[in-house]
């Protein structure tokens, strides 16, 4: 039962993450005119898509690498590399998303970083950068002692959850801000809840749902990578279920 709930949560998470990206892309394509890289508002349209993809979906996926039962046994280094690489990919996508909005603001002579959304977003990205470099230096490079890693691990996990929470808050405030900007025409104000508002609000609900599920899996003690010799009953069941599934796959695809 525990194993089934874990893998069902992973499937739901994958579906929610894909829907977050697809819904944001469709919103920008269908209601906001599509995409370009020319300094116009079409360049801005890359910003929400890339920020949702990087700071929410990829970041969330990278955060859960150590929750996979396959990562609980054997060498930890490959999983550390995967964890760092996915976060680096998320950060790269985020930087491109920031480039899009700053490029649009420069082209349109719009002031940078004046709204609460922008303050929250840039703070989140700065924390993400610090978190990645600290994690790379302490947990991936071999110089740090086990004592230092044990000391900083709870801090690393705490700020990881904080950054995801701030990312969700940034996305929600960004969706709201965008709708207030574009739905101020008297013929279709935001308060009349036109189709675009319903769709964008629904996208925000998807982002919140994705983030809450990531945080639930991230903070559930029975799904954390166990310390050596400290497996709980639920973790043992997850490991056994994982290897049964792996053995069944090998048997199915073995040459006759």
Curated annotation (Swiss-Prot):
Essential cofactor(s) = heme b
Q: Which SMART domains match?
A: B561
- Would you list which residues are glycosylated? 106
Q: Which residues lie on this side of the membrane: Cytoplasmic?
A: 1-3, 62-83, 141-154, 224-256
Gene3D superfamilies in alphabetical order: 1.20.120.1770
Residues in compartment: Lumenal: 25-40, 105-119, 176-202
Q: Enumerate the UniProt keywords alphabetically.
A: Electron transport, Endosome, Glycoprotein, Heme, Iron, Lysosome, Membrane, Metal-binding, Oxidoreductase, Translocase, Transmembrane, Transmembrane helix, Transport
Q: Which GO terms describe its molecular function?
A: metal ion binding; oxidoreductase activity; transmembrane ascorbate ferrireductase activity
Tree of life domain: Eukaryota
Q: Where is the Cytochrome b561 domain?
A: 12-219
Quaternary state and partners of this protein?
Homodimer.
Please state what the protein is called: Lysosomal membrane ascorbate-dependent ferrireductase CYB561A3
Q: In which organism is this protein found?
A: Rattus norvegicus (Rat)
Tell me the lineage of the source organism. Answer: Eukaryota, Metazoa, Chordata, Craniata, Vertebrata
Gene behind the chain: Cyb561a3
């Amino acid at each position: 039962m525990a194993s089934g709930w874990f893998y069902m949560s992973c499937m739901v998470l994958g579906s929610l993450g894909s829907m977050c990206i697809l819904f944001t892309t469709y919103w920008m394509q269908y209601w906001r005119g599509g995409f370009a890289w020319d300094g116009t508002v079409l360049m801005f349209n890359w910003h929400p898509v890339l920020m949702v993809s990087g700071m929410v979906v990829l970041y969330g996926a990278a955060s859960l690498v150590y929750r996979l039962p396959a990562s609980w046994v054997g060498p930890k280094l490959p999983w550390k590399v995967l964890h760092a690489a996915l976060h680096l990919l998320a950060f790269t996508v985020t930087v491109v998303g920031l480039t899009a909005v700053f490029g649009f603001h420069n082209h349109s002579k719009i002031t940078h970083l004046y709204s609460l959304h922008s303050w929250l977003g840039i703070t989140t990205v700065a924390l993400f950068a610090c978190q990645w470099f600290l994690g790379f230096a302490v947990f991936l490079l071999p110089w740090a002692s086990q004592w230092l890693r044990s000391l900083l691990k709870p801090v690393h996990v705490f700020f990881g959850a904080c950054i995801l929470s701030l990312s969700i808050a940034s996305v929600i405030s960004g969706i709201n801000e965008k709708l207030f900007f574009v739905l101020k025409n008297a013929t279709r104000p935001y308060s009349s809840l036109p189709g675009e508002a319903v769709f964008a609000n629904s996208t925000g609900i998807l982002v919140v749902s994705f983030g809450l599920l990531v945080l639930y899996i991230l903070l559930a003690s029975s799904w954390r990578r166990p310390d050596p010799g400290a497996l709980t009953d639920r973790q043992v069941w997850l490991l056994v279920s994982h290897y049964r599934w792996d053995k069944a796959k090998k048997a199915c695809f073995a040459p006759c």
